[in-house]
């Protein structure tokens, strides 16, 4: 047997076999969240008529709450005088977030004048109909936003769009990534970092500031 043939049967045998495809999976780029622009936000917020719905939208837009987090709020979770909200997020993880002063006023007015009398301790209740006084459900919240998207002419006006607008606004304001992660309730820092990509003006400002410091050190 020729020497070359013997070698191919041993160390070089792989040259005669078709290469199998690599089983490594390439991670697909993370889809960046879509927030609302100023006009869309104003139109959507302007369509709400009840203090309950305004407060719900405000908690999403100015405190970054998810739909499920809003619906899980209990009356005791909202500290209006100190303007804090206790939030139970994914995996039953708790965080405390600031309460915008205007949203605090909406919640207070809702509690005093609009919230139905009920044995339920849930913050947001059904306002009318046969389920009046019962906790607002995910289906009920979807109905509210579906109606107001149509009224406002803002097809992208979903609850998560308000939350994403909150995250984007923080990134544009230059909020520290760790603070952004804490406010948004993200388990992974890369989830928060996605908002930095949505704020190119902040990225450019940070870059220019860093370059200015470098030039000053030369």
What do these predicted ranges mean?
Residues 1-218:
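Conserved catalytic core of the tyrosine transesterase superfamily
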């Amino acid at each position: 047997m020729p020497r070359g043939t013997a070698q191919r049967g041993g160390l070089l045998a792989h040259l005669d076999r078709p290469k199998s495809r690599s089983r490594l999976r390439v991670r697909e780029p993370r889809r960046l969240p879509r927030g609302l622009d100023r006009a869309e936000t104003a139109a959507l917020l302007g369509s709400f008529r009840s203090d309950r719905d305004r407060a719900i939208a405000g908690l999403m837009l100015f405190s970054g709450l998810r739909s499920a987090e809003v619906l899980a709020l209990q009356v005791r979770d909202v500290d209006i005088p100190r303007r804090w909200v206790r939030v139970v997020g994914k995996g039953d993880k708790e965080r405390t977030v600031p309460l915008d002063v205007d949203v605090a006023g909406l919640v207070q007015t809702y509690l005093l004048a609009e919230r139905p009398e009920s044995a339920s301790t849930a913050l947001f209740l059904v306002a009318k109909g046969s389920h009046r006084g019962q906790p607002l459900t995910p289906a009920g919240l979807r109905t509210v936003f579906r109606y107001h998207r149509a009224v406002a002419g803002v097809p992208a006006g979903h609850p998560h769009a308000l939350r994403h607008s909150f995250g984007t606004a923080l990134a544009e304001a230059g909020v520290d990534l760790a603070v952004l992660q804490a406010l948004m309730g993200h388990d992974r820092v890369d989830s928060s970092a996605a908002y930095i990509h949505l704020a190119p003006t902040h990225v450019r400002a940070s870059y220019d500031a860093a370059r200015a410091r470098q030039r000053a050190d030369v």
